[in-house]
Design a protein with these regions (language model features):
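A late C-terminal transmembrane helix in Major Facilitator Superfamily
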Residues: 366-403
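Helix-breaking motifs and short loop linkers at transmembrane-helix boundaries and internal kinks
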Residues: 60, 92, 113-119, 130, ...
């Protein structure tokens, strides 16, 4: 990226061991902004899922129709990931994040104007396109602001914003619609206003390390103490020539559908299986996503701890991913749980496993690729994940209309992570730095 700082020639692992953490915490303020953006992204994304039982009763939606809304959202999201992956490499995360949140705020407000599944599917296209810029922008910012030894932890922190957003959404929407007895459209209006506050804060507070007015010299040196990287650009075809790219993309294709379907369909599962509604969705969803929040942080902490103990980067990432894959297995039995809280425990454990697994998978572009190629790879990975999510959402909607059972979905969720890790290891056994264009 053009606005990256000059770096020292010392290897990052050596520097991290020789230099103590610096004075100055600007990078953690940046991490806090990234965390807040992910929270808002997930709130805006999940409002519709929480409202689904009410909107289905009001407007006669079918599961297949709702599957179309979520499926086409993911198509637009995948295309947006390709766009923003390419764009962030060229304009940087500051302008990129402004553009992304501006677009998704327009789409979020547009949902107040429609009632049919077709109308919602169309209104959510700009929402999906804009939200697709969240992780390319956040990961690019993390690559700017955090050395390798801290990067997985930083990613884990802002990745946990997804779970905080998922926790807040049912409580907030339940308060607005069930307690205050407001029209459902107010759920979109109130949550959309939060985005405008964040946009103002981001524009004022985010700058790259070399030009940030509040960074200390010690903190800048800590961030810049990595090998100088040759600047350049890498297109899609260039990135796709490398097996390491396919390991990342395949991982996203296999595990992202699990998270997507949990996000969009869990309220419906609790409604159809246990009779829960907008007034009592809160406690089970809060419990699930608090568990997921812990998983995101622990997954990043565990691999970062292994790295600080001298474990090779690829081995540390894969150890953490394997542990997470094992914790996902019990969710295969969630559909048969007689008690909602047994189901919550199984699903929450799987969500924690997903977040820990994805935290380490998301670290791959920063670990293995030059910075000018990372956004492109992240975009390709997001497209692959959205493609998998589209297939899963369409299939689940049709399955529910025909047989009314979530059982096949939960079985697939349980085994997805072990399969993903196996394919990942086959395609990326040595986890070495990728050379692009002779760099």
């Amino acid at each position: 990226m053009s606005d990256l700082t000059q770096a020292a020639a010392t290897a990052p692992d050596t520097v991290a061991q020789a230099v103590p953490p610096p004075r100055g915490r600007v990078r953690w303020v940046i991490c806090g902004l990234l965390f807040a953006a992910v929270v808002l992204s997930y709130i805006d994304r999940l409002v519709l899922g929480v409202l689904k039982p009410q909107l289905t009763a009001l407007y006669g939606w079918t599961n297949s129709g709702y599957g179309d809304i979520t499926g086409y959202f993911q198509v637009a999201y995948g295309l947006g990931f390709l766009l923003f992956g390419w764009l962030i490499d060229r304009i940087g995360p500051r302008a990129g994040y402004m553009l992304a949140m501006g677009a998704w705020t327009v789409g979020h407000f547009a949902q107040t104007l429609v009632t049919s599944t077709t109308g919602f599917a169309l209104a959510r296209i700009p929402l999906a396109l804009g939200e697709a810029g969240t992780f390319p922008s956040a990961l690019a910012a993390a690559s700017q602001w955090f050395p390798k030894k801290e990067r997985a932890m930083a990613i884990g922190i802002f990745n946990a914003g997804a779970n905080v957003g998922a926790v807040v959404t049912p409580l907030l929407i339940g308060f607005l619609i069930a307690d205050l007895v407001l029209d459902w459209r107010w759920a979109f209006i109130v949550t959309g206003l939060f985005n405008l506050v964040w946009l103002t804060a981001w524009w004022q507070l985010y700058h790259p390390p070399h030009s940030h007015p509040r960074i200390t010299p010690e903190e800048r040196a800590w961030i810049e103490a990595e090998p100088v990287e040759t600047t350049g650009r890498a297109g899609f075809l260039t990135v796709l020539r490398h097996r390491e790219s396919w390991s990342y993309m395949t991982g996203r294709f296999l595990i992202d559908p699990v998270w997507w379907t949990f996000l969009f369909w869990l309220p419906d599962f609790f409604h159809s299986r246990y009779g829960y509604d907008l007034k009592n969705f809160g406690p089970p969803l809060v419990a699930i996503y608090i568990m997921a929040d812990v998983g995101a942080i622990v997954g990043g902490w565990y691999s970062s701890r292994l790295l600080k103990r001298g474990v090779e980067t690829g081995r540390a990432r894969k150890r953490a991913m394997f542990a997470c894959a094992l914790f996902a297995l019990p969710v295969m039995f969630a559909a048969q749980a007689s008690s909602i809280w047994v189901a919550v425990a199984m699903i929450g454990l799987a969500c924690a496993a997903h977040q820990g697994f994805s935290t380490n998978l998301f670290a791959l572009p920063g670990d293995q690729f030059p910075r000018y190629a990372q956004g492109t790879l992240i975009g390709l990975g997001g497209f692959a994940g959205a493609a998998g999510g589209f297939i899963a959402s369409k299939a689940l909607g049709a399955l529910l209309d025909r047989v009314g059972s979530y059982q096949p979905f939960f079985i697939a969720c349980g085994v997805a992570y072990l399969v993903a890790l196996l394919v990942f290891h086959i395609l990326n056994p040595r986890y070495r730095n990728v050379r692009i264009g002779g760099v």
